[in-house]
Amino acid sequence: MGRPQRADKQRRETDGPQKSRPSLTQAQKNSTTIRIHSDDHDQGRPNTNGYARQEQHAWEDASLHSLDFRLCHSSNLEDDEMHGTATDDMIPVNFDFVSPQVPHAMSDLGMYDFGSEATASDLLDPEPCAQFISLASHSAADHVEKATAERPGNDGSSSPSSSLLRTSSSPSQQAVEKLSDLNVQIHRQLTTDHGSLDSAGRRTQLSCAVVSMIEGLKTFRELLFDILSTTSRSPLQAAFRDGQNNGTSRPNTAASQNMQQHRRSGSMLSLSDCDAVSLSNSNSDSRPFQEGSHHFGCLDMSTSLLLLSCYANLILLCREVFAAIRRALPISGHQSTLLELSGFRIGSVAVQEDSDLQITILIQVVVRLIDGIGHCLGYPYSSTTERGEASPSDRGISLELLDLVLGPKGRQGQPSHIGQIEALREDIRNLSKIVYKSI
């Protein structure tokens, strides 16, 4: 008997009982392929180590069989045993360990952390997310007010300083707009009504011109004081700072009373219509613009130029009105013919029968208004205050700008604004000489 041949061993293994085992895995197929190639390569050499090779192949088959693992729901498995119930060692092939679930809509972004699993129901009906704060719907002032209201010790009521910050610029802006409208009206009246006071219907025209002049001066003075009072160095605020410096927290009542006197003095002339001009009862000894000190801060350039422009136009209007009154007075008998000023009243006393008294009152009223306006501007040239007497704190407009705009010198042969004021005073003096009766 010789050595058992390989063919006999393979025949015995084939004739033996068939064992149920799974199909060859990919690793076993690769091992078989490598073994076949190795056998083909060794065909030229004598097979002297057949039993060793058989044992090595058997050990490799046993090792690979112990490392087999099953995949559930796999379609390439032919054995029916692999379609049974899944056990703990089965791994689902549709599980993704790395990639997160991608949301189906942009609104789902941020709902699930990286690597977490979201079901289809979660994506279709997500849980409510935290509300986002819209920056456009809330202004910075709203956040400041909310933070101030939530501050400890704050009862929700706005402090005087906060209300002052919210409303300090509103009156000034409204006053500037009204001043601009007044300047346009006066300029239009100067350009369109020039020479109409000498026409045939001069009585009505002169009466309307007088009313416009007084109303313009009174409105300008009120707006001027409103604008100056809103600056950082208004009389009330200066008195409040002085009270704090002196150790008192209450503002000076004298400055407040002075402001009220300025307000009341603006209503000295109450003009009902174009045919009736009434004067309220006023004390001749009280001079609100000359009593006390006014601490006004310098205004900005645009507001200062607007004030000076309107003031210059008012001076020109006053000159034309007084020149028309002077021309309306005849050489003789002017007391019975000048009926345009018949609406003046002092309290309940009517003076319509004496035109000289009417003109005298009109002159005094205009002079008072012009002096008060000049004193507030800080460049008075008035009959009661000379230039340079006002302190820098009393000027609402810088002296350099006043000299530049009003200036002592005119341009292109025209008199300067200061020259216009002096010419107006000269016209008033000449008119006073005519209507004044010495006692």
Curated annotation (Swiss-Prot):
Compartmental location: Nucleus
Gene Ontology cellular component terms for the protein in this record: nucleus
Keywords: Nucleus, Transcription, Transcription regulation, Virulence
Record's compositionally biased regions (Polar residues): 20-35, 243-260
Region annotated Disordered, chain positions: 1-53, 143-177, 239-262
Basic and acidic residues composition bias: residue spans: 1-18, 143-153
Low complexity compositional bias, start-end: 157-172
Keyword Coiled coil: no
Principal subcellular localization: nucleus
UniProt superkingdom: Eukaryota
Described function: Transcription factor; part of the gene cluster that mediates the biosynthesis of pyrrocidines, fungal natural products containing a macrocyclic para-cyclophane connected to a decahydrofluorene ring system that show potent antibiotic activities toward Gram-negative bacteria.
Protein name: Transcription factor pydF
Organism: Acremonium sp
Lineage: Eukaryota, Fungi, Dikarya, Ascomycota, Pezizomycotina
